[in-house]
A protein has these predicted regions:
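Transmembrane alpha-helices
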Residues: 124-128, 160-194, 221, 233, ...
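C-terminal transmembrane helix and the adjacent membrane-cytosol boundary/short C-terminal tail
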Residues: 86, 143, 174, 178, ...
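Hydrophobic alpha-helical transmembrane segments of multipass integral membrane proteins
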Residues: 7, 11, 15-19, 54, ...
Length: 251
């Protein structure tokens, strides 16, 4: 996004927040359901100062990280195998495509029955929710590799390790990283869904509790925290993608 475009977006957001603040203060908006932005900011500062809220954020962050570290290598490896082994791909890909299109939330009660309401249940459900987009991303990444370059490399005696390092990885990197970024969105959503639906800790659990008790400033403040963390993670992955893009061009 160009600088002037960022300025326009920032000005639009600031204008909306100012309008929201004014309407809430003069009573045109029900402050019980939509408290003024200044009130939300005050609640945000108070929440970040509470040890139990920071502990809940740490729990959610740990679950998201654990699920991501399991889902990414597993999903991409499965995608690589399905693309490289035609028989396996013919057998498994229809199931992967089917499950990818099914809302994963319908399986949440099954995970609760199997694992109970626990951290392993949340991690397992997040992995299940995330892995399909990574498998499909792995398949697409392998299919993006120029086959003529692979054949020429083999003719000139390149080893399999050299082919993977010099041809496969540079060609696959953009799709793999884009799949990882998209997978993180599924991952965070799955963990929060578990915590809101049934959990004893985590920021999703607290969001559900504040919503049920109509503690709207705390609810909105928590949503701001989650959104900010999600954007930060996405931008971090985007920065990695940009750096690896430069490496890909050199390769």
């Amino acid at each position: 996004m160009r600088r002037h475009e960022r300025l326009i977006v920032a000005a639009a957001i600031l204008g909306l927040l100012t309008l929201w603040e004014v309407l809430a203060r003069i009573g045109r908006i029900d402050a019980t359901l939509a408290p003024a932005p200044a009130t939300i900011v005050e609640s945000l500062v108070r929440l970040l100062g509470r040890p139990e809220v920071r502990a809940s954020l740490a729990v959610t962050g740990g679950e998201v990280l654990a699920a991501f570290l399991i889902a990414v290598p597993t999903g991409l490896l499965l995608g690589f195998l399905l693309a490289e082994v035609p028989v396996l791909g013919a057998l498994v890909r229809p199931l992967v495509n089917f499950l990818f299109g099914v809302p994963k939330s319908i399986f949440l009660p099954v995970f609760i029955l199997v694992f109970g309401v626990s951290i392993p249940q949340k991690i397992a459900f997040a992995v299940f929710t995330t892995i399909f987009v990574l498998v499909l991303g792995g398949i697409a990444a392998v299919q993006s590799v120029p086959r003529e370059l692979v054949l020429v490399s083999r003719v000139y005696g390149a080893s399999r390790a050299q082919i993977i390092r010099e041809i496969y990885l540079p060609a696959m990197a953009p799709i793999l990283l884009e799949s990882a970024r998209l997978g993180m969105v599924f991952n965070i959503t799955a963990v929060l869904l578990c915590e809101i639906y049934g959990a004893r800790d985590g920021i999703g659990y607290r969001i559900a509790a504040w919503g049920e008790n109509l503690q709207m400033p705390q609810l909105y403040a928590a949503l701001v925290i989650v959104a900010a963390l999600a954007v930060a993670i996405n931008e971090m992955l985007r920065a990695i993608e940009t750096r690896l893009g430069a490496w890909r061009q050199r390769a």
